[in-house]
Amino acid sequence: MSLYPYAMAALDDVVTVLRAVAEPTRVRVLRLLQQGELTVSDICAITGHSQPRISRHLRILIDAGLLSRHREGSWVYYHRAPQIPAAVLALVDGIDDSDHQMSADAARLDAERHRRRREADEHFSRLAPTWDRERSRITPDAGVESRLLDIVMASNITRDAVVDLGTGTGRILSLLTPLATRAVGIDSNHTMLRHARTAVERTDGAAIELRQADVAATGLPDHTFDLAVAHQLLHFLDSPDMALREAARILKPGGTLIIVDLLAHQDETLRTEHAHRRLGFTSEQIERWCDGVGFDGLTEHRIDHSAGDLLPVCIWQATTTTRNQ
């Protein structure tokens, strides 16, 4: 098994990688990041180690080319590097799930994410009656919706079967329904879905289904939909790439993904007051995630937000590749 299957590596590089991996805590970190990006605080809480100790381990893994990092406001997220050697992944991911340390770490990660989902669910339930109005105070909703419809209608997008991931109050689903034959809205919050049901009942067009489910595990069949939309969803998620992976799974080969979300910004109050997990995204982040789960041909459409104090919004569009078949 070659550490570097696509190129010859210098001896010093191989030794650096082997030294970086040959430490239990660093193996635990690499294994945890299989589940998506984490902050230093996340890793400290799960492993039980101090921040200085974890920071030192992270630096070693970065220097070895095994991890990458990016900053969002005051938080720094760590993820597996795209060029991480396949042999390292095979060793780390090959550890038995029943191993005491691996299972304990996984349980703590699940518990932490469950706690956050519960807090977010309470937030969404509380704001559901005024959700659309609240969102319009920080994003240019009218411009976003108009541009979204232009993209869907003007391009060669098949839209017979549409799924709205994180449908919320059903606003976007109600806009897309007249353009489709079948439309499905997915959301994990029961209160939001109740409001969505009221919204879509007033809409003519496709046969509509609303389902309460995790956007990263919808339970929908493989290769079912022509178009998947994730409108202002990803910034609420701990692991946006998991939702994109699910979208790739349920889309037909050649199906279209449309992401509407905030561009990277620095407004920390959205974390503390509005349950945002991420302070927007760069196109480079979206492209990395899309490429990693089987999308191709990413394009971006930036929305004018010059009026007032609205945050910048972008619409990204990508297509599933044959890797998803």
Task: Map each language-model feature to its residues.
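C-terminal alpha-helical "lid/dimerization" subdomain adjacent to the S-adenosyl-L-methionine
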Residues: 256-316
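A short glycine-rich, Lys/Arg-flanked "PGG" loop and its adjoining helix->strand segment in the class I
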Residues: 241-256
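Beta-hairpin "wing" of winged helix-turn-helix
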Residues: 63-72, 79
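Conserved alpha-helix/loop element of class I SAM-dependent methyltransferases that forms part
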Residues: 139-160
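N-terminal helix-turn-helix DNA-binding core of bacterial DNA-binding proteins
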Residues: 9-52, 75-83, 147-149
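A short acidic, Gly/Pro-enriched loop at the edge of an enzyme's catalytic core
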Residues: 216-228
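Class I SAM-dependent methyltransferase SAM/SAH-binding core
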Residues: 161-163, 169-217
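Amphipathic alpha-helical dimerization/coiled-coil segments
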Residues: 2-9, 86-132
